[in-house]
From Swiss-Prot:
One of its GO terms (cellular component) is granular component. Residues 122-345, 383-407 are annotated as: Disordered. Residues 19-126 form the XRN2-binding (XTBD) domain. Regulates DNA damage response and cell proliferation in a dose-dependent manner through a number of signaling pathways involved in cell proliferation, apoptosis and senescence. It holds the Pfam family XTBD. Residues 452-527 form the DRBM domain. Interacts with CDKN2A/p14ARF, p53/TP53 and MDM2. Interacts with CHEK2 and MAPK3. Interacts with XRN2. Residues 184-198, 302-317 have a biased composition (Polar residues). Keywords: Acetylation, Isopeptide bond, Nucleus, Phosphoprotein, RNA-binding, Ubl conjugation. There is a cross-link at residue 176 (Glycyl lysine isopeptide (Lys-Gly) (interchain with G-Cter in SUMO1)). PROSITE patterns: DS_RBD (PS50137), XTBD (PS51827). It comes from Rattus norvegicus. This is CDKN2A-interacting protein.
Length: 570
């Protein structure tokens, strides 16, 4: 058929010239050969008979010609490109192209053909039979999750109620045991005090030591108990017991004043009051009562004990009884001073002042009274020295802690020696950076002063997903800088990447300094190869090791000083 068309055009050159005017620009010979046949088959009366008629075409004729050209192009697109058009257009162009044989047209499979093939094979499409099972599964999953949540809530509630019952039971048992323990302790203390009145001086000393040991054990035992409300309850219970014991001691002291019979009884009563004083002074702070009770209760007990002591001294008694009572008082006060450094100084001052007053009023022997005063003052001075030493030790511990903290904060990094392993880790990155910088320089026309060196270097490093580290330091802070730098160059800039030194620059501003440093760094990439080496640099007057980027031929001589310690940046 193609031969027939070519023969026809050779016989009618006028028609051939007219058809050539309908060819599109850039249309291939194969497409044009088949589309030309389509035009000639359906042209009919549109082919001009003479040149005059071709020039004087009417409007209807031109519209028909444009429609024919459009149909021919649609048919060519459908045959060679696989384009699809509305059904009316497809029917029209296929009917117009009957009889045209296209042997070398490509094969295009449409969507309908693919769906038909899939259905023939028995494979269901992705949209069929999927929605209902998925809905059912989602509903079943929701129901199962809701049931599991209900079971979890019920089990959590039962666990919480069981824990609360156990905790309440343990709290009740602990409070009961504590109250029984405190009542037993108070009863034992009262029985010991009653028995002490009928015994001698040795029994009094043993009683005071046993009471102090019992109090310390009780204090340690209660300090280990973790519950705060039980502590407050026991403290209030003990404070009420202490008030009742104080009232009983006051009545006993008044009775002793009225019935001042034998010196033996007065001494024993004074020793019993001192024992109660030591027990009250020790129990109050250990059981966790308030600070006011710590101060007020010892003062009251001191007054009662000093009054009994003065009454015992004013009576004409033997010196041995006075000495024994004073020794028992001083021993009890020393025990309290070791456990209570706060109230010891006030107790000793009251004792010394009242003993001095009793010495002026009494007619007893000066040696015994002097021994009492000297013992009390020595004990007071010892307690003060102990408190001072403890305070000094505590204050010495505080600055040592602060200095250790400051030293730990100042040392942020540990210096380690650089090895060849560090070079092996860094070298592959700079080999890739060398190629990237080379391509960037080619893109901007090579290395020249007109190029923004800082932006070019930063872009090359960011292309490899790394960052350019920039550090600025005023020139005044660098003592290792060469002396040929002028005073106007007041800013120093250092460039690093991957903890490797690239270059240093000085300038009037930060931008100028960074530009100079970037230019010096880019000069390294103009050589044949860049190498990471371990070199020595100066940092605050000391030589340190640093990773430096150099070209293969150069040797590190007079490197600029480091602005920051390299180990800090690793």
């Amino acid at each position: 058929m193609a031969q027939e068309v070519s023969e026809y055009l050779s016989q009618n050159p006028r028609v051939a010239a007219w058809v050539e005017t309908l060819r599109c620009e850039g249309e291939t010979d194969k497409h044009w050969r088949h589309r030309r046949e389509f035009l000639l088959r359906n042209a009919g009366d549109l082919v001009p008979a003479t040149e005059e008629t071709a020039d004087a075409e009417s409007g209807a004729r031109s519209r028909q010609l444009q429609q024919l050209v459009s149909f021919s192009m649609a048919w060519a697109n459908h045959v060679f490109l696989g384009c699809r058009y509305p059904q009316k257009v497809m029917d029209k162009i296929l009917s117009m192209a009957e009889g045209i044989k296209v042997t070398d047209a490509p094969i295009h499979t449409t969507r309908d053909e693919l769906v038909a093939k899939v259905k023939k094979r028995g494979i269901s499409s992705s949209n069929e039979g999927v929605e209902e099972p998925s809905k059912k599964r989602s509903i079943e999953g929701k129901n199962n999750s809701s049931v599991e949540r209900d079971h979890g809530k019920k089990s959590a509630k039962t666990d919480r109620s069981a824990q609360q019952e156990n905790s309440s039971g343990s709290k009740g048992s602990s409070t009961k045991s504590e109250s029984s323990g405190t009542s037993a302790r108070s009863n034992s203390g009262v029985s010991h005090q009653n028995s002490s009145t009928s015994e001698g001086d040795r029994s009094v000393c043993s009683q005071s030591s046993s009471n102090s040991s019992q109090v310390t054990s009780a204090g340690s035992g209660k300090a280990s108990e973790p519950e705060a409300p039980d502590k407050h309850g026991s403290a209030s219970f003990v404070s009420s017991l202490l008030k009742s014991s104080l009232n009983s001691h006051v009545t006993k002291s008044t009775d002793s004043r009225q019935h001042s019979g034998s010196p033996r009884k007065n001494a024993l009563e004074g020793s019993s009051v001192s024992v109660s004083q030591s027990s009250s002074e020790i129990e109050v702070p250990l059981l966790g009562s308030s600070g006011s009770s710590e101060v007020e209760l010892p003062l009251l007990s001191c007054k009662s004990s000093s009054e009994t002591a003065s009454s015992g001294l004013t009576t004409k008694a033997s010196s041995e009884a006075n000495i024994s009572s004073s020794v028992s008082k001083n021993s009890s006060s020393s025990g309290t001073s070791l456990l209570m450094p706060k109230s010891s100084s006030t107790n000793t001052s009251l004792l010394t002042s009242q003993v001095a007053a009793s010495l002026l009023a009494s007619k007893s022997s000066s040696q015994s009274s002097g021994s009492v005063a000297s013992k009390s003052t020595s004990l007071g001075s010892m307690s003060q020295l102990a408190s001072k030493s403890s305070s000094q030790s505590s204050t010495s511990q505080l600055p040592s802690k602060s200095t250790s903290q400051s030293s730990e904060s100042s040392v942020k990094f540990t210096c380690r020696k650089l090895t060849n392993e560090d070079i092996k880790q860094k070298q592959p990155f700079f080999n890739r950076l060398y190629k990237t910088v080379a391509w960037k320089l080619v893109a901007v026309g090579g290395f020249s002063p007109n190029v923004n060196h800082g932006e070019l270097l930063n872009a090359a490093i960011e292309a490899l997903k790394a960052t350019l580290d920039v550090f600025f330091v005023p020139l005044k802070e660098l003592a290792d800088l060469p002396q040929n730098k002028s005073s106007q160059e007041s800013i120093v800039c250092e460039l690093r990447c991957k903890s490797v030194y690239l270059g240093t620059g000085c300038g009037k501003s930060k931008e100028n300094a960074k530009a100079v440093a970037s230019r010096e760094a880019l000069k390294l990439f103009l050589k044949k190869k860049v190498v990471v080496k371990i070199c020595k640099r100066k940092y605050r007057g000391n030589e340190i090791e640093d990773l430096v980027l150099l070209d293969e031929e150069s040797r590190p001589v007079n490197l600029p000083p480091a602005l920051k310690h390299p180990q800090e940046l690793l």
